[in-house]
Each structure stands twice: as structure tokens, then as C-alpha cells.
Amino acid sequence: MARMHTRKRGKSGSKKVYGVEPNWVQYSKDEILNIAVDLKKSGMTSSVVGIRLRDQYGVPTVKAIFGKKLNKLLAEKGIRDEIPEDLNSLIKRYNNVAKHVELNPKDHSNKRGRDLIMAKMLRLVRYYKRTGVLDQKWNLSKVLR
């Protein structure tokens, strides 16, 4: 399948083996959940928490152990981001590109990139409002510079 804003194809990669609980993990489920909650409370994003669990604690994937994704587990513990992580990273990217375009007004390729990022953000906001992740009154202009 082609990518969203280009005609190029994605690259193939290895697939994760699902349904096999890793037996080499040295931590119990409660310990893994407590570590994840502590890391999230320290200000890390969910993806960084997953990377930290993988690299430092030897937990290959939370879903294989719990049967649920990390965000769902953290939401059950009452720890939830008000803006989803993918939308938040797009907002940061948009702000950086917008600042660059202000300083370099003749950079037309980045103006187009800024417009593509905005289109992707609007699409995500529409999806999150429809699924109930974001409030219906939430507005994207509040978080943009």
C-alpha cells in the first residue's frame, strides 16, 4: 500500500510473534505494571515507556504479557494523556515547521509540508472526536502557535 502523501511504497519488515508469552521475563505482571506507571508518571510518553521496558527491563512487548496494549493498561490505572501521543507529536512538528517557514518565507517545499501536516492533524482530530477520545468542543487552534 502507498503512503499517505506520496506515491512511494512502505518498506517491509519483520513481524512480531503474537500469542506466545515470553517466559524469559524476570518480572511479574504487577511489577511490570508498577514500573510502567512510574515511568509514565515521571513524564515519559507511552512509546518511550515501551522502549524503556524493552531495553532496560527485558520486556519484549506488554501486549504479549497482559493481552492489552500499554495505553489501555495505563488508562485503567487512571493515567491518560489529554492529547493522544501521535497527535501531540504532529502538533510539535507543525509548530517547528511553522517557525521555520516564518523565518524562511521562500521555502515552498516546507510550506507544502506544513500544509500536509495540518491535513493529517485535522484528519486525526476528526477521528478522535468521533471515537470519543477528544471532547467534541476541543479545538486544534488552542494548541497551535
Curated annotation (Swiss-Prot):
Cross-referenced Pfam families: Ribosomal_S13_N (PF08069), Ribosomal_S15 (PF00312)
Record flagged with keyword Ribosomal protein: yes
GO CC terms of this entry: cytosolic small ribosomal subunit
Domain of life: Archaea
An annotated GO BP: translation
Sorted UniProt keywords: Ribonucleoprotein, Ribosomal protein
Keyword Ribonucleoprotein applies: yes
Gene3D superfamilies the UniProt entry points to: 4.10.860.130, S15/NS1, RNA-binding (1.10.287.10)
Molecular-function annotations in GO: small ribosomal subunit rRNA binding; structural constituent of ribosome
Assembly with partners or alone: Part of the 30S ribosomal subunit.
Family: Belongs to the universal ribosomal protein uS15 family.
HAMAP family: Ribosomal_uS15_A
Listed name of the protein: Small ribosomal subunit protein uS15
